[in-house]
Amino acid sequence: MVQRLTYRRRLSYNTASNKTRLSRTPGNRIVYLYTKKTGKSPKSACGICPGRLRGIRAVRPQVLMRLSKTKKHVSRAYGGSMCAKCVRDRIKRAFLIEEQKIVVKVLKAQAQTQKSK
């Protein structure tokens, strides 16, 4: 005859926090083992990229708090909050803006010298 299984905790409904898996004990009994909820790795802070960040552990918030810093970020500018593609774009944009400022300054200086002559 098949062995009947009962939950080990008081909650008797099939909810997200009450998920179980079967496990065979050394005494050859089959019992329920409660599974932990799976975590998700963070999304990019830019809000444009659809995927999740690579190189960061996908764990629940309580576990994330206990992890060391090396497991919560990657060693790059904005590592752990922005994806590499967005960081690359941001650096390029900042460089081009700075270049544009320099060009404007040079043009102003040339116009000033033209005026003084």
Curated annotation (Swiss-Prot):
Biological process annotations from GO: translation
Keyword Chloroplast: no
Gene Ontology CC annotations of this record: cytosolic large ribosomal subunit; endoplasmic reticulum
Principal place of residence: cytoplasm
Location in the cell: Cytoplasm, Cytosol; Cytoplasm; Endoplasmic reticulum
PROSITE patterns given in the database record: RIBOSOMAL_L34E (PS01145)
Keyword terms of this UniProt record: Cytoplasm, Endoplasmic reticulum, Ribonucleoprotein, Ribosomal protein
Signal sequence annotation: none
GO MF: structural constituent of ribosome
The keyword Ribonucleoprotein is assigned to this record: yes
Free-text function comment from the UniProt entry: Component of the large ribosomal subunit. The ribosome is a large ribonucleoprotein complex responsible for the synthesis of proteins in the cell.
Assigned protein family: Belongs to the eukaryotic ribosomal protein eL34 family.
Subunit structure and binding partners: Component of the large ribosomal subunit.
Protein name according to UniProt: Large ribosomal subunit protein eL34
Natural source organism: Danio rerio
Primary gene name: rpl34
